[in-house]
Amino acid sequence: FGLVCATCEQIADSQHRSHRQMVTTTNPLIRHENRMVLASTTAKAMEQMAGSSEQAAEAMEVASQARQMVQAMRTIGTHPSSSAGLKNDLLENLQAYQKRMGVQMQRFK
């Protein structure tokens, strides 16, 4: 359990760093790409952590939804503003999952 917590902290810290860089970037295309990368890394992290819990199937489902959204956006070649919606969808999915798990991640707020 401690290892999972440490992994979560590490992921959250690296996401905070990339988020700070993303916020300071004014180019909308770069921000759009960063949001998609952030969604992908979050999905990957969830899949890695899911291996050690009984709610693994649910975590995998949320992660694969995020992956599919990013893949669809890359395929279609979406407008930069649409990735803001991706971020909100991903956060909603994560928060719903955490409520069911009884976990609150304060860092995402």
Swiss-Prot record:
Most abundant protein in virion. When expressed alone can form virus-like particles in transfected cells. This is Matrix protein 1. Pfam families: Flu_M1_C. Plays critical roles in virus replication, from virus entry and uncoating to assembly and budding of the virus particle. M1 binding to ribonucleocapsids (RNPs) in nucleus seems to inhibit viral transcription. Interaction of viral NEP with M1-RNP is thought to promote nuclear export of the complex, which is targeted to the virion assembly site at the apical plasma membrane in polarized epithelial cells. Interactions with NA and HA may bring M1, a non-raft-associated protein, into lipid rafts. Forms a continuous shell on the inner side of the lipid bilayer in virion, where it binds the RNP. Homodimer and homomultimer. Interacts with NEP. Binds ribonucleocapsid by both interacting with genomic RNA and NP protein. May interact with HA and NA. Cannot bind NP without genomic RNA. Residues 22-109 are annotated as: RNP-binding. It comes from the Viruses. Keywords: Host nucleus, Membrane, RNA-binding, Viral matrix protein, Virion. The gene is M. GO terms for molecular function: RNA binding; structural constituent of virion. It is a multi-pass membrane protein. It comes from Influenza A virus (strain A/Camel/Mongolia/1982 H1N1). GO terms for cellular component: host cell nucleus; membrane; virion membrane.
